[in-house]
Amino acid sequence: MDLWSTRSASLELLDSELAEQRRSIETAFKLIDRGIDFFNEHAPNDQYSRICALALAKARNYAHGAYGMILDNLAQEAGALMRPFLEYYELLIYFAKDPSRVSEAAEDRLPKAGKRAELIGSDFKGFREYLNENASHSSYSYHSMRHQIDFESMSIRKTQDFAPEPLFRNLGDLFAQLALLAFQTAISVSVKDFQAGVELSLEAESLRDEGGGHFRLDERLSKTPESSP
Protein backbone atom coordinates (compact mmCIF):
# COMPACT_ATOMS: atom_id res chain seq x y z
CA MET A 1 0.00 0.00 0.00
CA ASP A 2 1.36 3.39 -1.02
CA LEU A 3 -0.48 6.10 0.89
CA TRP A 4 1.57 8.88 -0.66
CA SER A 5 1.51 8.11 -4.39
CA THR A 6 -0.92 10.93 -5.18
CA ARG A 7 1.07 13.42 -3.11
CA SER A 8 4.32 12.31 -4.75
CA ALA A 9 2.85 12.88 -8.21
CA SER A 10 1.55 16.29 -7.13
CA LEU A 11 4.97 17.27 -5.78
CA GLU A 12 6.58 16.23 -9.06
CA LEU A 13 4.23 18.58 -10.91
CA LEU A 14 5.02 21.39 -8.44
CA ASP A 15 8.70 20.90 -9.26
CA SER A 16 8.07 21.16 -13.01
CA GLU A 17 4.98 22.59 -14.71
CA LEU A 18 3.61 24.25 -11.57
CA ALA A 19 6.91 25.60 -10.24
CA GLU A 20 5.74 29.23 -10.48
CA GLN A 21 2.55 28.40 -8.65
CA ARG A 22 4.49 26.60 -5.92
CA ARG A 23 6.75 29.64 -5.46
CA SER A 24 3.71 31.91 -5.15
CA ILE A 25 2.27 29.76 -2.38
CA GLU A 26 5.62 29.60 -0.61
CA THR A 27 5.99 33.37 -0.85
CA ALA A 28 2.59 33.79 0.78
CA PHE A 29 3.69 31.60 3.67
CA LYS A 30 6.89 33.64 3.98
CA LEU A 31 4.94 36.90 4.27
CA ILE A 32 2.75 35.34 6.94
CA ASP A 33 5.86 34.11 8.76
CA ARG A 34 7.26 37.62 8.74
CA GLY A 35 4.11 38.81 10.44
CA ILE A 36 4.49 36.14 13.12
CA ASP A 37 8.14 37.14 13.57
CA PHE A 38 7.12 40.78 13.96
CA PHE A 39 4.55 39.96 16.62
CA ASN A 40 6.97 37.64 18.41
CA GLU A 41 9.42 40.52 18.76
CA HIS A 42 6.78 42.63 20.50
CA ALA A 43 4.92 39.86 22.32
CA PRO A 44 6.76 39.93 25.67
CA ASN A 45 5.37 43.36 26.53
CA ASP A 46 2.30 43.66 24.33
CA GLN A 47 -0.93 41.68 24.56
CA TYR A 48 -2.09 42.68 21.08
CA SER A 49 1.08 41.20 19.58
CA ARG A 50 0.76 37.97 21.58
CA ILE A 51 -2.86 37.41 20.61
CA CYS A 52 -2.29 38.29 16.94
CA ALA A 53 0.77 36.02 16.77
CA LEU A 54 -1.33 33.14 18.06
CA ALA A 55 -4.19 33.82 15.63
CA LEU A 56 -1.83 34.14 12.69
CA ALA A 57 0.09 30.99 13.62
CA LYS A 58 -3.14 28.99 13.95
CA ALA A 59 -4.38 30.24 10.57
CA ARG A 60 -1.01 29.28 9.08
CA ASN A 61 -1.26 25.78 10.55
CA TYR A 62 -4.70 25.21 9.06
CA ALA A 63 -3.54 26.49 5.67
CA HIS A 64 -0.46 24.27 5.81
CA GLY A 65 -2.64 21.26 6.62
CA ALA A 66 -5.02 22.09 3.78
CA TYR A 67 -2.05 22.40 1.40
CA GLY A 68 -0.96 18.85 2.20
CA MET A 69 -4.47 17.48 1.78
CA ILE A 70 -4.82 19.22 -1.58
CA LEU A 71 -1.61 17.49 -2.70
CA ASP A 72 -3.31 14.22 -1.73
CA ASN A 73 -6.31 15.23 -3.90
CA LEU A 74 -8.42 15.55 -0.75
CA ALA A 75 -9.45 19.14 -1.34
CA GLN A 76 -13.05 18.55 -0.30
CA GLU A 77 -11.91 17.25 3.08
CA ALA A 78 -9.41 20.11 3.31
CA GLY A 79 -12.45 22.38 3.44
CA ALA A 80 -12.88 21.22 7.04
CA LEU A 81 -9.60 23.00 7.81
CA MET A 82 -10.53 26.16 5.94
CA ARG A 83 -13.49 26.80 8.25
CA PRO A 84 -11.26 27.50 11.30
CA PHE A 85 -8.73 29.18 8.99
CA LEU A 86 -11.47 31.65 8.09
CA GLU A 87 -12.31 32.18 11.76
CA TYR A 88 -8.72 33.08 12.63
CA TYR A 89 -8.47 35.33 9.57
CA GLU A 90 -11.60 37.16 10.72
CA LEU A 91 -10.26 37.33 14.28
CA LEU A 92 -7.29 39.29 12.97
CA ILE A 93 -9.71 41.75 11.35
CA TYR A 94 -11.73 41.89 14.58
CA PHE A 95 -8.63 42.78 16.62
CA ALA A 96 -7.25 45.26 14.08
CA LYS A 97 -10.52 47.21 14.07
CA ASP A 98 -10.39 47.55 17.86
CA PRO A 99 -7.13 46.39 19.47
CA SER A 100 -8.71 46.46 22.94
CA ARG A 101 -10.69 43.37 21.88
CA VAL A 102 -7.61 41.18 22.39
CA SER A 103 -8.51 41.15 26.09
CA GLU A 104 -11.60 39.14 25.15
CA ALA A 105 -9.35 36.46 23.66
CA ALA A 106 -6.95 36.54 26.61
CA GLU A 107 -9.87 36.03 29.00
CA ASP A 108 -11.59 33.44 26.77
CA ARG A 109 -14.74 35.52 26.36
CA LEU A 110 -14.79 36.18 22.62
CA PRO A 111 -18.20 36.59 20.98
CA LYS A 112 -19.38 33.70 18.80
CA ALA A 113 -17.86 33.53 15.32
CA GLY A 114 -21.11 34.63 13.69
CA LYS A 115 -21.34 37.69 15.92
CA ARG A 116 -17.72 38.61 15.21
CA ALA A 117 -18.38 38.27 11.49
CA GLU A 118 -21.35 40.60 11.85
CA LEU A 119 -19.30 43.16 13.79
CA ILE A 120 -16.57 43.29 11.15
CA GLY A 121 -18.98 43.26 8.19
CA SER A 122 -17.65 39.96 6.86
CA ASP A 123 -18.31 39.06 3.22
CA PHE A 124 -17.85 35.33 3.84
CA LYS A 125 -21.27 34.33 5.16
CA GLY A 126 -22.07 32.28 2.05
CA PHE A 127 -18.66 30.62 2.02
CA ARG A 128 -18.94 29.82 5.72
CA GLU A 129 -22.37 28.25 5.20
CA TYR A 130 -21.06 26.19 2.27
CA LEU A 131 -18.21 24.84 4.41
CA ASN A 132 -20.59 24.08 7.26
CA GLU A 133 -22.95 22.16 5.01
CA ASN A 134 -20.43 20.28 2.88
CA ALA A 135 -17.03 20.10 4.59
CA SER A 136 -16.94 20.92 8.30
CA HIS A 137 -19.56 18.37 9.38
CA SER A 138 -20.66 14.88 8.34
CA SER A 139 -22.85 15.16 5.27
CA TYR A 140 -24.17 13.05 2.42
CA SER A 141 -24.66 16.06 0.17
CA TYR A 142 -23.64 15.84 -3.47
CA HIS A 143 -20.72 18.23 -2.93
CA SER A 144 -19.48 16.17 0.03
CA MET A 145 -19.65 12.75 -1.59
CA ARG A 146 -19.37 13.01 -5.37
CA HIS A 147 -15.58 12.51 -5.41
CA GLN A 148 -15.98 9.27 -3.42
CA ILE A 149 -18.06 7.59 -6.13
CA ASP A 150 -16.80 5.97 -9.31
CA PHE A 151 -19.88 6.58 -11.43
CA GLU A 152 -18.79 4.12 -14.15
CA SER A 153 -18.64 1.13 -11.82
CA MET A 154 -20.90 2.64 -9.14
CA SER A 155 -18.36 1.67 -6.50
CA ILE A 156 -16.87 3.68 -3.66
CA ARG A 157 -13.32 4.91 -4.09
CA LYS A 158 -10.93 4.11 -1.25
CA THR A 159 -8.35 6.65 -2.43
CA GLN A 160 -8.18 9.69 -4.68
CA ASP A 161 -5.94 9.44 -7.74
CA PHE A 162 -3.63 12.17 -8.95
CA ALA A 163 -5.57 14.69 -11.05
CA PRO A 164 -3.62 17.65 -12.53
CA GLU A 165 -6.54 19.94 -13.36
CA PRO A 166 -8.25 19.77 -9.95
CA LEU A 167 -4.83 20.18 -8.34
CA PHE A 168 -4.24 23.42 -10.24
CA ARG A 169 -7.70 24.73 -9.42
CA ASN A 170 -7.56 23.79 -5.74
CA LEU A 171 -4.09 25.25 -5.29
CA GLY A 172 -5.43 28.46 -6.83
CA ASP A 173 -8.21 28.52 -4.24
CA LEU A 174 -5.67 28.03 -1.46
CA PHE A 175 -3.43 30.75 -2.86
CA ALA A 176 -6.32 33.23 -2.96
CA GLN A 177 -7.00 32.62 0.73
CA LEU A 178 -3.32 32.86 1.63
CA ALA A 179 -3.09 36.16 -0.26
CA LEU A 180 -6.02 37.50 1.77
CA LEU A 181 -4.27 36.42 4.96
CA ALA A 182 -1.04 38.09 3.81
CA PHE A 183 -2.90 41.38 3.30
CA GLN A 184 -4.54 41.09 6.71
CA THR A 185 -1.15 40.32 8.22
CA ALA A 186 0.06 43.66 6.88
CA ILE A 187 -2.98 45.47 8.28
CA SER A 188 -2.57 43.83 11.68
CA VAL A 189 1.13 44.71 11.77
CA SER A 190 0.35 48.32 10.82
CA VAL A 191 -1.60 48.73 14.08
CA LYS A 192 1.76 48.50 15.90
CA ASP A 193 4.13 49.78 13.20
CA PHE A 194 2.57 51.64 10.28
CA GLN A 195 5.68 51.60 8.09
CA ALA A 196 6.29 47.88 8.60
CA GLY A 197 2.66 47.25 7.69
CA VAL A 198 2.95 49.32 4.52
CA GLU A 199 6.04 47.40 3.44
CA LEU A 200 4.28 44.09 3.96
CA SER A 201 1.18 45.31 2.13
CA LEU A 202 3.22 46.30 -0.92
CA GLU A 203 4.76 42.84 -1.04
CA ALA A 204 1.34 41.26 -0.57
CA GLU A 205 0.01 43.35 -3.45
CA SER A 206 2.86 42.21 -5.69
CA LEU A 207 2.24 38.61 -4.64
CA ARG A 208 -1.48 38.94 -5.39
CA ASP A 209 -0.84 40.26 -8.88
CA GLU A 210 1.92 37.82 -9.79
CA GLY A 211 0.43 34.74 -8.15
CA GLY A 212 -3.05 35.61 -9.38
CA GLY A 213 -1.66 35.60 -12.89
CA HIS A 214 0.03 32.24 -12.40
CA PHE A 215 -3.24 30.73 -11.19
CA ARG A 216 -5.35 32.61 -13.78
CA LEU A 217 -7.62 33.90 -11.03
CA ASP A 218 -8.98 36.80 -13.10
CA GLU A 219 -10.05 34.35 -15.79
CA ARG A 220 -11.80 32.18 -13.22
CA LEU A 221 -13.53 35.13 -11.56
CA SER A 222 -14.77 36.44 -14.90
CA LYS A 223 -16.69 33.24 -15.62
CA THR A 224 -20.38 33.37 -14.84
CA PRO A 225 -22.05 30.39 -13.15
CA GLU A 226 -23.73 29.58 -16.46
CA SER A 227 -20.43 29.39 -18.33
CA SER A 228 -18.47 27.54 -15.65
CA PRO A 229 -17.87 23.82 -16.22
Regions found by a protein language model. Name each.
Residues 81-82, 89:
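Internal, conserved structured core segments that host functional sites
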Residues 34, 87-103:
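Short, charge-rich amphipathic alpha-helical segments embedded
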Residues 1-56, 62-65, 69-81, 103-229:
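A cross-kingdom marker of C-terminal helix-rich interaction/assembly modules
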